[in-house]
Amino acid sequence: MTANAARLPTNPSNTNLLLRDGKLLALCEGGPPAVLDPLTLATLKSSDTYGVASFFAAHPRVDPADGTLIGCGLSLGATSLESALASIEAGLSPASLLPSFPAPLNFFEWRRGAPRPQRQRAHTLPFFTFVHDLALTPTRALVVLPPYVIPDVGAYASAILGQRAVGMCFEWRPELGTRVMVIERRTLELEALVRLPDPAPTCYHVINAFEERAEAEGTEGTEGTEGAEGGGDVLSLQICEQANGDRPMLEAQYMDIAQAAFVAELQCKAVEYRLRLPPKSPPPSTSSGGDGAGEPAVASCVERVELAASARPFELPDVHPSYVGRRARYAYTWCLADDESTFANALQRIELVEGGETSEVVTFGAGRAAGSPLFVPTDEGEDEGYVLTFVYDGARHETDLVILDAADLSGDTVATVALGQHLPPLFHGIWEDDVGTV
């Protein structure tokens, strides 16, 4: 235990991948990314040179319009002098680089082709929780903050002192409510903090987000325009909401993954929350250090809609990358083939509207289980592309890469690539046409 004192666990870097600045970054929200050579997978130097003054959450998002990446991560203090100096240069105040409780959430902007993020801003959280995913629109970034929290300094100190794992310090506190943090991309300022309706929903992943004009209560508007007089913009946030809302039951499965049962109630359904923002007002006065100290505007959740109610319980959805931040019709999901399954093992396409249609559930035969879907576009149409998945074959103890037609998911397989080996269950992957140009 003494060897672990004052030493945070290393980041597993096992959740997602990002190609940036000619490097492959392996991500998990528990720390900075591992940096790899994308051609050889050799580990390269520390990511401190990127100047991100925080951890690096697993799901930064890329704006399809210009390739700008927006990411976030908890800031537990600068990890090195080099990181601290780069962060101050990017706009953070020195005070925001010191440890605090709860840890602030740092947002950063990284333009395509730049060697590191250009802007950063840290914001105080209402409670100490880790952030896994982020949603993006043309003008905002949104993160969901479920009340799965480290409750106090004492619990946090026990992790720092090596007395127990960080994951063992969290408690489900539904009375705190689930919040959505809305960040204005132009300034990286906190625009609003919205509480979602009780009982507090919980999720790991978002599906998408988009903006609409706020004409009046209950009316549809035009995507991506300013709010009407008397009301601000309306943001639609679509999330993978855990079906039974029992976060402790879900987390208990990770304690012994070999015996885990991710049954239907622990999987997700697609839910859209419509958030009404107040009319635009002059930005609050903040210090030049960029510590995100301004008070957020008062905003509200005006509607909750369950989408594609007939969809199979699912996780790890994917959409056409050109539709990130704007209204998408389809998502491709990793779902349970039937109610007897204890792990997601099939694929489905769902329509992201109330009462939306769903495709047939795509299965791959007895003893074969699909992994999460990855959409690879061939054109701008939402279903113009391929869906890739790794399929494990229990009889052969090997994994195949299976390629499906996104427009006809349950039709004939486009191609199957036998890998000749077993791949363990995976989370997320990426596709890049030319690794050398990123």
Regions found by a protein language model. Give the residues of each.
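Beta-propeller domains
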Residues: 1-217, 229-438
